[in-house]
């Protein structure tokens, strides 16, 4: 579920390019296998934001459950089209495999850092121009929510880390945990553009990916809202 799979969208793209999976299966994979790890959710979101490991474990459980529920929804009876053509797998020397893996890992790492920095900068510019505050104010008026809550939502839509970090100081409550669950499952536009860069050149459907992440985030928020009301 992302962690077990490694969240390796570059790997999904290569498998699709090699014909190992169908386009529909690859499109499902990038939605389903795109989740935050337990260290970030429990440590950064739970302990760092809410000062509670219990809240972190709760958010992680909601995060995984939402992914599982969405996975069942999108392919309840979908066939798994896997190619077992042995000709696709050719022997490679250890030195060549090691060199290629290090290069691909470095490229992915640089790409991830670049998108995080870019969207953090965009977030900073929007804050400096008071655009975020203005939009948050409108949302606060329409939804009847706190200004800081709306500002965190907007930050989380752009970049996951900034969104979760913006929630620091908010109390443990169903509505705040629901917001954290939404941001964690949505992932942020920064993560989405990282995914797009990895699957570029393939026929994997990006529209399904965006819709899937948004629906998963809504499921997570609903689960957190209901669960937190009973637990916290």
Regions found by a protein language model. Name each.
Residues 40, 67, 71, 108-120, ...:
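Hydrophobic alpha-helical transmembrane segments in multi-pass membrane proteins
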Residues 52-53, 71, 75-83, 128, ...:
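Transmembrane helix-loop junctions in multipass membrane proteins, especially transporters and channels
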Residues 102-180:
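Transmembrane helical segments that form the transport core of multi-pass membrane transport proteins
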Residues 78-104, 137:
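Intrinsically disordered, low-complexity non-transmembrane regions of multi-pass membrane transporters
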Residues 55-71:
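Alpha-helical transmembrane segments
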Residues 1-50, 153-170, 177-202:
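Alpha-helical membrane segments and immediately flanking helix-loop junctions
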Residues 47-56, 170-174, 229-232:
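Helix-coil boundary and interhelical linker segments in multi-pass alpha-helical membrane proteins
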Residues 39, 64-68, 173-232:
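C-terminal transmembrane helix pair
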